[in-house]
């Protein structure tokens, strides 16, 4: 650790401020190489007292002499001035030693004047081995002039759980606050804090809390006027103006998404989805899904879905007449036209000079005695 100066006599008022924030007491013991350090760096000292010099508070786990008699100092300590909104302390656990801290209390006793004190570190954790800044904030609300009392209680322990440093119990400190004025004022219940910035209530934002916050946001040019309430432009409605109020009718399953505008399903176009992209209509229940491209329903195929499909097929002696219905050539029968009539039966049943027709009753009756009929197929 670099050598730091003793507390300068010219800054007696800073002594009181230091005690206001962190009037620590230390356990007696010999200095240790691996130990705890706490100080105010030169930059923060310049802000507070006008000159740059590190101010040592804790060295090698022991308090600087000026911090010992807190009770006597508390009787004459002044309130933290209006222009000081926060104070930075730097701390470090030197070497390999581990130190744990906990902020037991950060509490304002005058919440109409000042909110609870703040720190920029977790309320419970370890003191870092690298020099790090702990900022204690005094958030005046700016609602009124006055002096706010507050409480800061922190404890530091070693790795064995023994208390090394702790603020005195029931120590009360004071901060001077004043009413602030924000240029343009704060609207919708917002108030001007000590930094002359509007702090807005839930549901509003903006420099003057003039903008309402809608979740989800207003769409299609809608205006959020109060939290969760949108005023929609002509042609739109809904909680967040997400729905179009269409006078235009969208045909063929189209959806109106903007006044006068339709989103068309695949295969359709036009202002009202009235134009098919297929010059020739798709047959047998097929749907146009692109330019001259049909999506066929089950049992049909082809560019226009005009060809029926038979599974597994009608073979070399039949043609597919309807989905899964084969029309067999003369002399053939069966589900897939793969069975042939006997020649003697054909000649016996066919009159002289006549041709066998596919649906000849006498032939069909003769075959029904030999082969059971197969339904849903044409012989």
Swiss-Prot record:
Any one Gene Ontology BP term: negative regulation of Wnt signaling pathway
Residue intervals of the EGF-like domain: 178-210, 211-242, 243-271, 274-306, 307-338
Alphabetical list of PANTHER family matching this protein: EGF-LIKE-DOMAIN, MULTIPLE 7, 8 (PTHR14949), WNT INHIBITORY FACTOR 1 (PTHR14949:SF32)
Keyword Manganese: no
InterPro entries, alphabetized: Dev_Signal_Modulators, EGF-like_CS, EGF-like_dom, WIF, WIF_sf, Wnt-inh
Name of the protein in its database record: Wnt inhibitory factor 1
Protein localization: Secreted
């Amino acid at each position: 650790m670099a050598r730091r100066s003793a507390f300068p006599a010219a800054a007696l008022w800073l002594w009181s401020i230091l005690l206001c924030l962190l009037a620590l007491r230390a356990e007696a013991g010999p200095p240790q190489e691996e130990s705890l350090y706490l100080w105010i760096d030169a930059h923060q000292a310049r802000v507070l007292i006008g000159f740059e010099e590190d101010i040592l508070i804790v060295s090698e786990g022991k308090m600087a002499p000026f911090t010992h008699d807190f009770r006597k100092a508390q009787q004459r300590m002044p309130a933290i001035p209006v222009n000081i909104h926060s104070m930075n302390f730097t701390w470090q656990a030197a070497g390999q030693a581990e130190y744990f801290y906990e902020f037991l209390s950060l509490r304002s006793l005058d919440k109409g004047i000042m909110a609870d004190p703040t720190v920029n570190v977790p309320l419970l954790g370890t003191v870092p081995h690298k020099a790090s800044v702990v900022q204690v904030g005094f958030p005046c609300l700016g609602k009124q002039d006055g002096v706010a009392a507050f409480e800061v209680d922190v404890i530091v322990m070693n790795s064995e759980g023994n208390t090394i440093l702790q603020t005195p119990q029931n120590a009360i400190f004071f901060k001077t606050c004043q009413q602030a004025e924000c240029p343009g004022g704060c609207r919708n219940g917002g108030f001007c804090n000590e930094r002359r910035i509007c702090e807005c209530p839930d549901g509003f934002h903006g420099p003057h809390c003039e903008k309402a916050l809608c979740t989800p946001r207003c769409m299609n040019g809608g205006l959020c006027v109060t939290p969760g309430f949108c005023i929609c432009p002509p042609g739109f409605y809904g909680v967040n103006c997400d729905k179009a109020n269409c006078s235009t009718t969208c045909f063929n399953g189209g959806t109106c998404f903007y006044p006068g505008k339709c989103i068309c399903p695949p295969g359709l176009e036009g202002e009202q989805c009235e134009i098919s992209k297929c010059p020739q209509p798709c047959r047998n229940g097929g749907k146009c899904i692109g330019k001259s491209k049909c999506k066929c329903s089950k049992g049909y195929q082809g560019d226009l879905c005009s060809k029926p499909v038979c599974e597994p097929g009608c073979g070399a002696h039949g043609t597919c007449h309807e989905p899964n219905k084969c029309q067999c050539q003369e002399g053939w029968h069966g589900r897939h036209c793969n069975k042939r009539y006997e020649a003697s039966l054909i000649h016996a049943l066919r009159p002289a000079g006549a041709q066998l027709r596919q649906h000849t009753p006498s032939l069909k009756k003769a075959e029904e005695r030999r082969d059971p009929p197969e339904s849903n197929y044409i012989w």
